[in-house]
């Protein structure tokens, strides 16, 4: 009886679909929960609880039906997903543990990442491309890669899309000798991109000379034979730190780049194998996320 009176406070629990972890006010024995480092109760350790008075439709009686098998299922599913529950963020909500395995959720996350990669591409622009090319996903990705700001980023002259759009908005960029003031300007095969003569061009040339890693410097480094291994490892680590912020003189196969003259030309239409993204997207396989625009009109 003393234990019942002293232990009055209880900890809030997550309300799961499988297992129905609910709140209990009075208990004696406690064991740590593997999920949240908290307390959970087994069937044998519970006291018969008094039912609450019904004040309305929302208030319901507490149930003591609680099995060990359901706990094991919950724990195994949580460890697969890697879900973590924190003390402050626990709320009474039904959560589908199989939600991440569904194809719709995977496609929706890819859809949002894809739009953020192109600097929050508006749905209006995205839907216009979808209607124009009749839902052909390969052609949509090719057209997005033909934009001027994306070509600058893929070439290596620019570190981010923000910098590329700043150059275009300030009218430092030329396409076939004419100013391109829009970042969504589409480039055709055979077009030549260049920079205006001025301060912006000089800054880019200085940065590229310092930043580019030439092939000759790599060969010299490999051919050297140092006497001591410790000194050799120290030099390699030091060189790796310097080369982190540098830009490599490489680009995709569908672009021809000259770093000395700051010229870019599109030779072929971009292929899906040559396109790379920072997140895990295989454009050859996971292109079906664009078809969400058909079924669900209110995508954010």
From Swiss-Prot:
It comes from Dictyostelium discoideum. The gene is mrps4. SMART domains: S4 (SM00363). InterPro entries: Ribosomal_uS4, S4_RNA-bd, S4_RNA-bd_sf. The keyword Iron does not apply. Belongs to the universal ribosomal protein uS4 family. One of its GO terms (biological process) is regulation of cell cycle. This is Small ribosomal subunit protein uS4m. GO terms for cellular component: cytoplasm; mitochondrial small ribosomal subunit; small ribosomal subunit. It is found in: Mitochondrion. Its main location: mitochondrion. The keyword ATP-binding does not apply. It comes from the Eukaryota.
């Amino acid at each position: 009886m003393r234990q019942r009176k002293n232990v009055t406070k209880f900890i809030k629990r997550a309300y799961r679909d499988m297992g129905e972890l609910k709140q209990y006010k009075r208990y004696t024995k406690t064991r740590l929960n593997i999920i949240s480092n908290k307390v959970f109760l087994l069937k044998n350790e519970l006291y018969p609880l008094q039912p609450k008075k019904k004040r309305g439709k929302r208030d319901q009686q507490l149930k003591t039906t609680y099995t060990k098998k359901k706990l094991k299922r919950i724990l195994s599913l949580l460890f697969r997903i890697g879900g973590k529950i924190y003390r402050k963020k626990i709320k009474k909500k039904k959560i589908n543990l199989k939600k991440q395995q569904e194809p719709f959720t995977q496609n929706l996350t890819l859809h949002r990442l894809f739009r953020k990669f192109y600097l929050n591409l508006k749905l209006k622009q995205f839907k216009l491309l979808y209607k124009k090319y009749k839902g052909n996903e390969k052609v949509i990705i090719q057209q997005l890669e033909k934009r001027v700001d994306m070509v600058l980023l893929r070439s290596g002259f620019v570190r981010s899309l923000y910098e590329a759009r700043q150059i275009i908005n300030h009218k430092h960029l030329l396409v076939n000798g004419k100013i391109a003031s829009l970042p969504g300007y589409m480039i055709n095969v055979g077009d030549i991109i260049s920079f205006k003569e001025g301060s912006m061009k000089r800054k880019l040339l200085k940065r590229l000379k310092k930043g580019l890693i030439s092939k000759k410097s790599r060969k010299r480094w490999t051919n050297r034979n140092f006497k001591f291994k410790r000194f050799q490892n120290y030099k390699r680590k030091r060189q790796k730190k310097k080369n982190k912020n540098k830009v490599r003189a490489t680009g995709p196969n569908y672009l021809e780049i000259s770093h000395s003259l700051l010229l870019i030309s599109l030779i072929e239409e971009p292929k899906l194998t040559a396109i790379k993204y920072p997140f895990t997207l295989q454009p050859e396989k996971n292109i079906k996320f664009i078809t969400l625009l058909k079924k669900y009109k209110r995508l954010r």
